[in-house]
Structures are given as C-alpha cells and as structure tokens.
Amino acid sequence: MKKIVLMVMMAMAVLTTNAQSEYPTSKVEKHDVAILVIDMQNDFVDPKGKLCVAGAKATVPAINKLIAYGRSKNWKVVWITRDHRTSGVDVDAPRIPLFVDGKTGYCVPGTWGGALVDGLKPEKEDIMSPKYRNSAFFNTNLDLMLRRMGVKTVVLAGTQYPNCVRGTANDA
C-alpha cells in the first residue's frame, strides 16, 4: 500500500498560510487522509505533567486548526495516546523509576496525566488508539484500522517529536 507521511513538527509546519486563505496551503485534500494526533496528554503537554515537553501546550491551537481543516475535507482523526499500567511493568527501562517507590507513573489511563490536555476534544466518530511504545504502529492495530478505513495518507501532529512522532513516521 502506498503511504505518504507528512510530518508536522509540533503541528506547526502544515499550518503555514498564504494571504488569500486562513487554511493550510497543502495540496493534500483527498478523502483518504487521516490525522494522527500523537501524545497530546497532560503528562507530556501540561507544564505540571511528569514529562512535559517545553512549548507543547502552545501547539494546542495549531492542532485544533489542523483538525478543523481536516474535518472540513472529511479526513479521519485518530487520537494516539501513550498508555501504561500503574505497576510500570510495560514501560521502557529508563522510565521505570517513575513507577517505583509509590510513584504513580505517567500516562496511566484514568489519571489526570493520561488524559488529553484541555483544549483538545475528540468527536464521537474519531478513533482512539492507545500505544505502548514510541511508534503508534508498533504492536498495535493502527495499521489494520487505517487500511480498513481506506487511508493512504497520514498527517502527523503532536508532541514528543524526537521519540513518538518520529517513530510513528518511520513505521508508517
């Protein structure tokens, strides 16, 4: 299957506008497109988060603009979240210390840190797809879901660019 990956560093690059339009100048306007919103959870985005990425909170308006544009073109929206068990048994070795000695860890489903940051809200037709490693494709059913939806192009937006956005782009 042909896949084209448009990487959006911190969701900003695709939102370049021209004088005639408030919308992105991208030529991608087909209906076989999905936006993958990656790791926009409190622990990564909110300044009080355990692994906050500097500047990530400022990308929320740009991501919302990208999503609105995509929805106007009937693009799919897939929310990729990093999910870990409270025990930390499923985390990468360098992050195990965040789960020991009574610590609650990060990106645990059902916790504040694991929730999407304020300002981003999935709609009922959106897909929620948890991941357990950097890439949204590694050991998940994301590829199967995208194929079944007829998606041939993915637009990546989110945080943790050196790890999760890039890992997802590499595996796409």
Residue ranges and their predicted role:
Residues 110-159:
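Internal catalytic-core helix/loop-beta-alpha segment
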Residues 9, 46-48, 88-89, 137-138, ...:
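Active-site-proximal flexible loops/turns
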Residues 1-4:
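Positively charged n-region of N-terminal signal peptides that target proteins for export
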Residues 161-168:
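Short glycine/serine/threonine-rich phosphate/pyrophosphate-binding segments
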Residues 172:
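Short conserved active-site loop signatures built around small residues
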Residues 9-17:
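Hydrophobic h-region of N-terminal signal peptides that target proteins for export
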Residues 19-123:
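Active-site acidic carboxylates
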